[in-house]
């Protein structure tokens, strides 16, 4: 397990606490034990804290402080799970795949199509599973959204927006170590980039194509007003249907909002279809409470019980029920199926079946990574004094081409086809 921060604590840790001593069942294989062998963090301090609290329940995994390759004990592992800051994903995943280890990467998988191409090629060459986790695809609301689209009940999305706001304590405290030179679009907007691309594209059968990406943003709180660390980002993504119609989506993200707003995060979306409108607001679908001296700072007024709360079951066992945990269990089960679900001569056929899962395989992440790479390129140009850029997709000049106002020279971000 590489990366031991909030994502590990809220998603991976609950899984390992349940699977270390209790196997889960895979029909083609039988009982599967998923054990945490190694903890990797830059200093090892976070690993010590985890072991002091959960070491015995986790089977006392080894703790390693390593700020650069190689990963100690890699040869003893079957898979590497990566939940580090996004600009460290590629090198960790590459090292694991070179060692013929399966990888599961937190969103976004990587920051450029060049990196995605390299990881995909390594996974194919070495017969490994290479997957990316987008937990919001497992949100019950989003499962319902996809079901209505897949079944043709809501048809042909035309436009929409999403706003995703996080408090200043995220950027100034929790993530302050790594946000220098980063932006909330790549970290937060990517949830909805993938949701839109997968739900309205692959799931609907429409076979639309990514056409244009635009972005702008603001600076001055998380970093200098003329620097490369962004407070908020406004992203626009445009697609084209085969019949020439287009769809456009605006995704606004910020991680410098007041700490005192009612929820842990504030997320609102609207999607407008040919025959329907979908509206969703994360804070308005659940519980509201007030506790003197605790809300809204220590405990939020609209707690997110379905994701990150610790709950006491009727039988007095504490657990976290968060959505998306099944993705991790499924990854372990699919590794077991790949390696033990039949005769060795049929392994390639099993691998082909597993790689066809567009929602999680790296091969299904092309549009998402393309949008991230385009956004990063636009914001980089903005920080360098050239705002207002637009990236065109799969045009005559290349797969991703950055066009800046008043500049006749086009910058090719990615030559191949997206």
Question: Which stretches of residues belong to each language-model region?
Answer:
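Short helix/strand-capping hinge loops at secondary-structure junctions
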Residues: 100-102, 106-108
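Redox-cofactor binding/interface segments in oxidoreductases and associated redox assembly factors
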Residues: 81-82, 105, 162
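N-terminal glycine-/serine-/threonine-rich beta1-alpha1-beta2 phosphate-ribose binding loop
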Residues: 1-99, 117, 121-125, 351, ...
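NAD(P)-dinucleotide binding in Rossmann-like oxidoreductases
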Residues: 243-329
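C-terminal helix-rich "cap/oligomerization" subdomain common to oxidoreductases
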Residues: 79-81, 330-418
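Rossmann-like dinucleotide-binding domain that binds NAD(P)(H)
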Residues: 172-266
């Amino acid at each position: 397990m590489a990366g031991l921060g909030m994502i590990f604590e809220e998603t991976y840790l609950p899984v390992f606490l349940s699977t270390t001593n209790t196997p889960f069942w895979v029909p083609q294989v039988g009982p599967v034990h998923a054990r945490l062998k190694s903890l990797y963090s830059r200093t090892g301090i976070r690993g010590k804290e985890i072991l002091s609290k959960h070491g015995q329940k986790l089977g006392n995994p080894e703790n390693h402080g390593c700020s650069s390759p190689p990963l100690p004990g890699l040869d003893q592992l079957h898979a590497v799970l990566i939940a580090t800051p996004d600009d460290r994903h590629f090198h960790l995943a590459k090292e694991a795949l070179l060692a013929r280890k399966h990888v599961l990467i937190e969103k976004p998988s990587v920051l450029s199509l060049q990196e995605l191409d390299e990881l995909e090629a390594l996974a194919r060459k070495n017969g490994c599973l290479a997957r990316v986790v987008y937990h919001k695809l497992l949100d019950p609301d989003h499962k319902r959204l996809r079901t209505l689209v897949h079944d043709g009940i809501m048809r042909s999305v035309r436009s929409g927006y999403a706003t995703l706001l996080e408090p200043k304590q995220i950027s100034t405290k929790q993530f302050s170590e790594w946000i220098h030179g980063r932006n909330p679009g790549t970290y937060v907007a990517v949830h909805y980039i993938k949701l839109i691309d997968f739900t309205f594209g692959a799931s609907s059968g429409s076979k639309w194509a990514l056409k244009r990406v635009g972005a702008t943003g603001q600076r001055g709180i998380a970093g200098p007003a003329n620097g490369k660390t962004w407070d908020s980002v406004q992203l626009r993504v445009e697609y084209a249907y085969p019949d020439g119609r287009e769809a456009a989506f605006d995704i606004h993200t910020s991680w410098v909002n007041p700490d005192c707003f009612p929820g842990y995060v504030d997320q609102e979306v609207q999607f407008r279809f040919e025959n329907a409108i979908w509206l969703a607001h994360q804070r308005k679908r659940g519980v509201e409470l007030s506790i003197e001296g605790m809300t809204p700072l220590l405990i939020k007024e609209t707690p997110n019980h379905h994701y990150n709360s610790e709950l006491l079951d009727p039988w007095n066992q504490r657990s976290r029920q968060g959505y998306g945990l099944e993705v991790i269990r499924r990854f372990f089960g699919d590794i077991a199926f790949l390696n033990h679900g039949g005769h060795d001569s049929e392994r390639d056929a099993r691998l082909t079946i597993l790689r066809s899962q567009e929602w999680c395989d790296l091969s299904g992440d092309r549009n998402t990574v393309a949008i991230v790479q385009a956004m990063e390129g636009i914001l980089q140009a903005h920080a360098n004094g050239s705002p207002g850029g637009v990236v065109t997709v799969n045009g005559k000049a290349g797969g991703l081409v950055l066009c800046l106002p008043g500049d006749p020279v086009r910058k090719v971000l990615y030559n191949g086809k997206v």
